[in-house]
From Swiss-Prot:
Its EC number is 2.3.2.27. Keywords: Apoptosis, Autophagy, Metal-binding, Transferase, Ubl conjugation, Ubl conjugation pathway, Zinc, Zinc-finger. Pfam families: USP8_interact, zf-C3HC4_2. InterPro entries: NRDP1, NRDP1_C, Znf_RING, Znf_RING/FYVE/PHD, Znf_RING_CS, Znf_SIAH. The gene is RNF41. This is E3 ubiquitin-protein ligase NRDP1. A zinc finger (RING-type) spans 18-57. It comes from the Eukaryota. Interacts with USP8, ERBB3, PRKN and BIRC6. Interacts with CSF2RB, EPOR, IL3RA, MYD88 and TBK1. Interacts with CLEC16A.
Length: 317
């Protein structure tokens, strides 16, 4: 449908008026033979009833329509039109070709996006702001989040159940292998290979770490701290066969000779940067696995590995 003629300043050339809606042409198209021009929406609707020109009744179809000449487009673009939002207080009069850009920024546009400044920060059309209720919106947001959290908790529980079943299957398999090892001693090597590969897979899944404050090492962690680190090891996928050994090796009483006392640690501190360390997820702690630190002397590593806990200074590389 065309633009209302009363919105324009001055007289509008009759050649720019749509014969169907009697408004100023909007998205104009032209019949090629008779050269009559119409709004695109108007003529499309007309053709749904009959395939003729509304003015002279000559045969015309949608396929025949063409854009109007440039001179007509230029005449239309120069027309001065009042803003669509005049009824809402906008007094702007702009060129027709600038109307859309003006509408997108017009402060009187009732559909212009605005942000609630009462606390919830919701973006909404301007005309909805007077009836907006922050509490109602936030309640809806909380409900959506609670629903999402419930879905995630359900998924997490399912994954934990699957993981527990897999771990149980692995333990049963290991128990089976130990049971038949007496029948075939060669299975000892097979079991050791499987466990070693399992350890390597876990170690490779951890993020490499750098310790920036070796002086913050906690060499005598209490039972509570050890339990926290053990839980993180288990959650990271640490093989059950070495979890307890690693936690035992978190205390200086189980450390190798080069780390056994404060004095020896100070003497050997220059070697610390040579350690290949992996971060225990979410903790200020690292594991120094023997399989990754064969370049270190026997007095600096321990089978299957060391757990070093720090007050601060552990960074992922």
């Amino acid at each position: 449908m065309g633009y209302d003629v009363t919105r324009f300043q001055g007289d509008v050339d009759e050649d720019l008026i749509c014969p169907i809606c009697s408004g100023v042409l909007e998205e104009p198209v032209q019949a090629p033979h008779c050269e009559h021009a119409f709004c695109n929406a108007c003529i499309t609707q007309w053709f749904s009833q009959q395939q003729t020109c509304p003015v002279d009744r000559s045969v015309v179809t949608v396929a025949h329509l063409r854009p109007v000449p440039r001179i007509m487009r230029n005449m239309l673009s120069k027309l001065q039109i009042a803003c669509d939002n005049a009824v809402f207080g906008c007094s702007a009069v702009v060129r027709l070709d600038n109307l859309m850009s003006h509408l997108s920024d017009c402060e009187h546009n009732p559909k212009r996006p605005v942000t609630c400044e009462q606390g919830c920060g919701l973006e909404m059309p301007k005309d909805e702001l007077p009836n907006h209720n922050c509490i109602k919106h936030l309640r809806s947001v909380v409900q959506q989040q609670q629903t999402r959290i419930a879905e995630l908790e359900k998924t997490s529980a399912e994954h934990k159940h699957q993981l527990a079943e897999q771990k149980r299957d692995i333990q049963l398999l290991k128990a089976y292998m130990r049971a038949i090892r007496s029948v075939n001693p060669n299975l000892q090597n097979l079991e050791e290979t499987i466990e070693y590969n399992e350890i390597l897979e876990w170690v490779n899944s951890l993020q490499p770490a750098r310790v920036t404050r070796w002086g913050g090492m906690i060499s005598t962690p209490d039972a509570v701290l050890q339990a926290v680190i053990k839980r993180s090891l288990v959650e990271s996928g640490c093989p059950a066969s070495i979890v307890n050994e690693l936690i035992e090796n978190a205390h200086e009483r189980s450390w190798p000779q080069g780390l056994a006392t404060l004095e020896t640690r100070q003497m050997n501190r220059r070697y610390y940067e040579n350690y290949v360390a992996k971060r225990i997820p979410g903790k200020q702690a690292v594991v120094v696995m023997a399989c990754e630190n064969q370049h270190m002397g026997d007095d600096m590593v321990q089978e299957p590995g060391l757990v070093m806990i720090f007050a601060h200074g552990v960074e992922e590389i």
